[in-house]
């Protein structure tokens, strides 16, 4: 199988180490992975802001670039969910059949559900608290949404439990939003910051050293709170742990 690696623009610009770790992780698991150098934004910021024409152009470019791969994998539940749930409708208005939406996966979802490894050759001797992003929980179902009252599961935890030396915790109010929400963080700054502060405190109450998640946008928001208030905790993307050898 041939896998196309999709790296969202904010990871490319702000957390390039997450993109590098994603590539290395997939290679270490025996995946034939390719990174298209001319990829661009998936169009989510434009669509969320109401710029339909701009988001359509980017959705069309994305589909043309990735549609020939067997799988498309990205380290962002938010952007992956946007492609999966919104690109078909956006492109339908142009008479274009979206071929990429049915084969795109968040990287953790892909490893857990498609590759199904029995072990991951990683070591991370630290305490971590899992952050479930809204898109990951409610659109990709990477973990069980608490409001559905269904049996517990968490694919992030399943993968982290394979890492040597790690201690994994989960905060109270595990499905509660961190307050980022894209444009929400700009338009409702005070509320967004308050939500972020509450979320970080929930994670800190577990006694962890790191907040770990699958969405760098959420982690970026909480990192802002942590830096502003000089809190003794760090953020880390899950792929950085799964690809870790130290």
Question: Predicted regions span which residues?
Answer:
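Iron-sulfur cluster-binding electron-transfer modules in prokaryotic oxidoreductases
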Residues: 1-246
